[in-house]
Amino acid sequence: MSKPTHISYNSIEQYRNQLRDLKQAKKKQVFNIPDEVEFIGTIKLHGTNCSVCYSNSTGMYCQSRNNIINLTYDNQGFCMLVEKNKRNFENFFQILAKKYDINLDIYTLSIYGEWCGERIQKGVALMRLPKCFCIFDCKVTNQNDKDFVSYWLDVSFKDNDTCVIASPTEKIYNIYDFETFKITITIDNYSDSQQKLTELTEYVEKCCPFAKKLGVEGTGEGIVWRCCYGDNQRWIFKTKGEEHKVSKEKVLIPVDTEKVENIKQFVDNTCTKNRFEQALEYIYKINPDSPLYQQTPKMKDVQYIINWIRDDILKEEKDTILENNITTRDIIPEISKKVVDMFKTCL
């Protein structure tokens, strides 16, 4: 048997970033991109990213977003769910391999989804549901070929109006069995789609359709939008409701980077309570690889929080930083100061 390798799920960009890249690709004629592109939206669930991978050489193994996990080194019980449903997952892999002609002696299939429900995340209707795994993607990789370009498989195919890659009785769902959305975006004038994106995102935030179908009403997080092109590649972005946005912006779904008057305004806009709480969740509750996992927060831990928030801001707000000619040297001291103040109030 070969040693399993962690196969990460890509970070999902914001609307303004992904659509800017799409517009540039169209200009450069990198791909045959039409003037109007249809995106399919699925409900964004507020939990923790997990996955199950399989090839004939590695066998089946589990992952959190950043680590390979197992029954000893688990992520809030996810591996236990997979172990109890081993036959179901083995069946999923065989169905996908047969449908898409995937040679599992060569390739690895990774089924990605959101592990969500009680005690995993707060502030959403999902917290009142039993823990469940909701599948939303499957990726094909070749771990022995560094030049191989990974690609995505459609997991939405159905039999009798129910997704095949799911086992609802075991609380293994498929996001395509729940409400989905469509929007057509004009590449050269994608601000035209801003209002509809805002309306749909607010609709999901007001009452999560996933939770509602399972019998609970309450706040949702947002929508993930996908458009496939070429050889099973895709464009993907997210839109979040106001309660779950980690940056303050003048509009819910911005299409351009915002101008800021000074460093303090940038830090106030980006080093928010939501981003701070997201850091605490990840460092203390979600990531078993964190040295502070399942520990009680203490003031001496603050540098871990600062580092996480700093890195997240630099990743998510790179375009705003460049647009406003801000340097990391300018913002890091202000971020650190604000994080320390917020951390003191939660101890």
Regions found by a protein language model. Name each.
Residues 1-347:
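Core nucleotide-handling region used for phosphoryl-transfer chemistry
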